[in-house]
From Swiss-Prot:
Pfam families xref list: GidB (PF02527)
Organism: Cellvibrio japonicus (strain Ueda107)
Gene3D superfamilies per the UniProt record, alphabetical: Vaccinia Virus protein VP39
MF terms in GO: rRNA (guanine-N7-)-methyltransferase activity
Function recorded in the entry: Specifically methylates the N7 position of guanine in position 527 of 16S rRNA.
Name of protein: Ribosomal RNA small subunit methyltransferase G
Cellular localization per UniProt: Cytoplasm
Similarity section: Belongs to the methyltransferase superfamily. RNA methyltransferase RsmG family.
Keywords noted in UniProt: Cytoplasm, Methyltransferase, rRNA processing, S-adenosyl-L-methionine, Transferase
CC annotations in GO: cytosol
Gene encoding the protein: rsmG
Length: 219
């Protein structure tokens, strides 16, 4: 194992442990292989403004893994999930690695980014991942999703309106946010209810992070 790989492995496992996440050996190798490919492809495909690989572990991998404890204990049956505006596969690829029993559709309109995702899916043998190169308003899935997750949407209104046609009855939106978006709840009041707010503890990150669980209001 190279010194760089050893450092990244230690950083990943220590950070994950601080958040109560314990990837197995195969999952650890897959997560590290993913971030190495992310760094390599980032040079040409501009997957992220972050260039340093240790920062990628902190700001991409650990941030994505911070929602694992909530999903693992969720009372909702999240067997079918979609990551909308996934970009380079965040949080979808790390979650697909951690939850091989669930299926994840990764949706993005950027062809360069979805080419990277097809490559990673094949390289890592992620049979539970489907990649879709489409805009959300043009995507007509064969089946609806129990969980719609994203860390990319500008607002909760954009997310819940844009993804309304993807959510199965009884399903939930999982919105990953920085500061608690108080103002974003106003435009969706009466249509969408805030089920739960989770203050995420993201290792190696000082700023606030929140996971908002949302559901359409009963008519």
């Amino acid at each position: 194992m190279s010194d760089v790989n050893s450092v990244l492995r230690k950083q990943l496992l220590n950070g994950a442990a601080q958040m109560g996440v314990a990837p197995g050996e195969r999952q650890t190798e897959q997560l590290l292989a993913y971030i190495r490919e992310f760094e390599k492809w980032n040079k040409a495909y501009n997957l992220s403004a972050v260039r340093d690989v240790t920062q990628m572990v902190a700001r991409h991998l650990l941030d994505s893994l911070s929602v694992v404890p909530w999903i693992a204990r969720s009372p909702y049956p999240l067997a079918r999930m979609i990551d909308v505006g996934t970009g380079g596969g965040l949080p979808g690829i790390p979650l697909a690695i951690m939850f091989p029993e669930k299926t994840f559709t990764l949706l993005d309109s950027n062809g360069k980014k979805t080419r990277f995702l097809f490559h990673v899916k094949t390289l890592l043998g992620l049979d539970n991942v489907t990649v879709e190169n489409r805009r959300v308003e043009e995507f007509a899935p064969a089946g609806l999703f129990q969980g719609v997750i994203s860390r990319a949407f500008a607002s909760l209104q954009d997310m819940t309106e844009g993804c309304a046609g993807l959510l199965a009855p009884g399903g939930i939106y999982l919105a990953m946010k920085g500061l608690f978006p108080e103002d974003e709840l106003v435009p969706i009041a009466g249509k969408i209810r805030l089920v739960e707010t989770v203050k995420l503890q993201v290792a190696e990150t000082d700023g606030e992070r929140h996971l908002l669980i949302l559901q359409p209001q009963e008519p």
